[in-house]
């Protein structure tokens, strides 16, 4: 009898711990501590680590020589000096010159200086977020996925922490069009570094629903893996994902995800969703009248976590219905009930979550 009671108590403790973990709000460092240092630099990742982020994001694209690098766009010209160093290595897309990572070897990409993001206006580079780390200062470079995993795992060993990773497989449709299977390459790299099961501290995210389903239903089983998979959600008008129909690339239509029953369909192949904030709280909301959609409720009813993007405190990035950054966090974490947030300012989000416990 005593033995049985011991087993029951142990089981309750385990269940209690699991429930507590499941109820914890997580902070995902969006491109690292990108509000303070150039996005996706190893320096931004180190800063995010020591700010207490639960997970650190990696956007992953592929090079000409099949290496995986951490870069938000599948082109290089927004965050490096590629235009100056390789002026003729561009493609013209919709009348715009773009220097695609897939057209450069890793050695060539490593020769570039990475910087705070910018746009070119009237022939001049204009920093995207004026109050952030100054463009063109110090030295930063594009890192490989393996370099970043080794950094985070090394810090986990030296600090005794267990900070997770949150890789995004970028534009698999584009890589496939170029003859490369980026999803297999990313998953094999994760497996190499010991990320193989759901209990491991990793989420794999992707905007492409066709590919996300393939990852969950085909690739993970084939590789002997079982990871948490997150379906990112975009507006169809963003042209985030393209699909091949009758030999032509056409925009993928996300509209079904916003219909009643849409979350149940996503839950057939995903463990969570990553929606844009206005998909959860309408922009026309006011402080006295928050217009909250049913997406979080329906996702939770179907056993999925919800991690919206992107929480920023830059000028013009806090919606009018929130007083400040912390009020915005309170609305989403406590009133809407999301399970975590993607933010460029992980220190502020970590402090808020800790103070709320």
Region locations from a protein language model:
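Bacterial N-terminal signal peptides that target proteins for export
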Residues: 1-8
């Amino acid at each position: 009898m005593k033995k049985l009671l011991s087993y029951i108590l142990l089981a309750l403790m385990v269940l209690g711990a699991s429930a507590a973990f499941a109820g914890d709000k997580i902070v995902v460092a969006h491109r690292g501590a990108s509000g303070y240092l150039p996005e996706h630099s190893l320096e931004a990742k180190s800063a995010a680590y020591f700010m207490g982020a639960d997970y650190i994001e990696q956007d992953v694209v592929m090079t000409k020589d099949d290496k995986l690098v951490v870069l938000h766009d599948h082109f290089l010209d927004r965050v490096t000096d590629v235009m100056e160093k390789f002026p003729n290595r561009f493609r013209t897309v919709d009348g715009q010159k773009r220097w695609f990572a897939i057209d450069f070897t890793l050695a060539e990409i490593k020769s570039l200086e990475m910087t705070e993001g910018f746009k070119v206006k009237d022939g001049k580079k204009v920093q995207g977020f004026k109050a952030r780390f100054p463009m063109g200062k110090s030295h930063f470079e594009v890192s490989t996925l393996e370099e970043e995993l080794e950094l985070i795992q090394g810090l986990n060993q030296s600090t005794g922490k267990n900070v997770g990773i949150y890789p995004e497989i970028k534009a698999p449709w584009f890589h496939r069009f170029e003859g490369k299977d980026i999803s297999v390459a990313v998953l094999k790299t994760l497996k190499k570094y010991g990320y193989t099961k759901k209990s491991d501290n990793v989420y794999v995210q992707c905007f492409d629903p066709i590919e996300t389903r393939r990852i969950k239903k085909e690739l993970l089983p084939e590789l002997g893996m079982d990871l948490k998979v997150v379906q990112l959600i975009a507006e169809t008008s963003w042209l985030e994902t393209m699909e091949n129909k009758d030999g032509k690339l056409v925009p993928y239509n996300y509209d079904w995800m916003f219909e009643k029953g849409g979350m149940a369909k996503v839950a057939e192949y995903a463990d969570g969703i990553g929606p844009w904030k206005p998909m959860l709280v309408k922009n026309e909301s006011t402080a006295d009248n928050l217009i909250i959609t049913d997406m979080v409720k329906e996702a939770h009813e179907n056993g999925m976590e919800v991690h919206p993007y992107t929480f920023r405190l830059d000028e013009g990035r806090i919606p009018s219905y929130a007083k400040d950054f912390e009020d915005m966090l309170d609305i989403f974490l406590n009133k809407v009930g999301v399970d975590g947030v993607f933010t460029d300012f992980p220190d502020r989000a970590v402090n808020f979550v800790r103070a709320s416990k």
